[in-house]
Amino acid sequence: ALMVASLHKYGHYIIDLKPANVSIYKKTMTVAMFDCDGFSIQGEQARFPAEFVSEEYIYPEGMAQSCEDMGEEQDKFALAVIIFKLLNNGIHPFSGVAKKNADSALSIQERIEQYHYAYGMWGDSYQAPHPYSIHEFLPQSTMKLFDRAFVKGQKRPTAAEWQAELDFLLKNLKHCKKNPNHAYFTNKGCGL
């Protein structure tokens, strides 16, 4: 989130932001971005647009745009997807279990386009949360940011807001008494 916020401060956008383009080096905890041809760079005279964007990370409003026209909203959405997956067992925020009344199976990108986000305060008519989801154990403040990121008509959190929330989560991380290798975020307990 810090890297994304820093780039946004200078008017640059990642656009093709996805886990495969991010690496963390264990020894130094340095974060590196790869495959940077998906960036949109603001030059002194002109913008050098992105050339690529990846499905499952494209914001709903961006489906009608070319990646050359995408900007900060694309990065805000993709960053929220990555953070959701990191905090929720690798589950994509638009994946879930289709309800019995669902007419057909939709791809993740189709679910994004139709705002089928099952993990929010209001649930979803198309799908229920994935059975291995642990979203209910996340703090309310984190869930509110996810709702803002994925519910239609909301103002998506900035990278700086995510940075502050992740700092909050790290500072409030609790260790499980039953398993020293396990940690959790809220007073709801760890589930073990």
Where do the model's predicted regions map?
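Conserved C-lobe activation region of Hanks-type protein kinase-like domains
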Residues: 74, 83-143
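Terminal C-lobe "cap" of eukaryotic-type protein kinase domains
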Residues: 148-174
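Catalytic-loop of the protein kinase fold
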Residues: 4, 8-26
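Conserved end of the kinase activation segment
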Residues: 62-73
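Regulatory extensions appended to serine/threonine kinase catalytic cores
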Residues: 164-167, 171-192
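Activation segment/activation loop of eukaryotic-type protein kinase catalytic domains
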Residues: 20-62
